[in-house]
């Protein structure tokens, strides 16, 4: 990478899409591309699925504990989805961006708005993935073989609510080809890391230039 962790402030990279549009696959590819991108491990009140590891896939917590964290301001964002609570613990995110590491969020539009409006919002980069078509979106959901017909129908009904908020994101990509979309994401992230606000060391550099100019005058 062009800028080391010591030279920049980390990004909160928000990746949103309706279920089946490819965000989980692309999130994994981005983490494989750059070790400075870590995945935000969400807290949830739902039961663990087979193979899921507490603290790695999710932080599995009780409803009471979750609500207490929200009340204490310890959740960067939170939502109630399909009968369960989900949220992003704030502490680990704050630590990561202060150390120059990016944090990737695989969340819906409601969570994206909460993060963007938070005290860390100025460091966000939000990207929305659109499917090529609704027909293709359904085909992808069915081909995954993870959900029954009722769950797929419910996800499809929710998909338009998610898609309708595409205009509130910094960047929007149509994910027709995974490889092309991955390259576009890398380009966006690389450019955003160069924003002035992500490079606090520029202030000292500018002061040094001013001092040098005055010394030479």
Swiss-Prot record:
Function: Essential for recycling GMP and indirectly, cGMP.
Keywords: ATP-binding, Cytoplasm, Kinase, Nucleotide-binding, Transferase
Domain of life, source organism: Bacteria
Pfam family, one: Guanylate_kin
Record carries keyword Cell wall biogenesis/degradation: no
Cell compartment(s), UniProt: Cytoplasm
NCBIfam families per the UniProt record, alphabetical: guanyl_kin (TIGR03263)
InterPro entries linked: GK/Ca_channel_bsu (IPR008145), Guanylate_kin-like_dom (IPR008144), Guanylate_kinase (IPR017665), Guanylate_kinase_CS (IPR020590), P-loop_NTPase (IPR027417)
Guanylate kinase-like domain segment(s): 10-190
Enzyme Commission number(s): 2.7.4.8
An annotated GO cellular component: cytosol
Catalytic activity field: GMP + ATP = GDP + ADP
Name assigned to this protein: Guanylate kinase
Entry GO MF terms: ATP binding; guanylate kinase activity
Binding residues for ATP: 17-24
Family per similarity comment: Belongs to the guanylate kinase family.
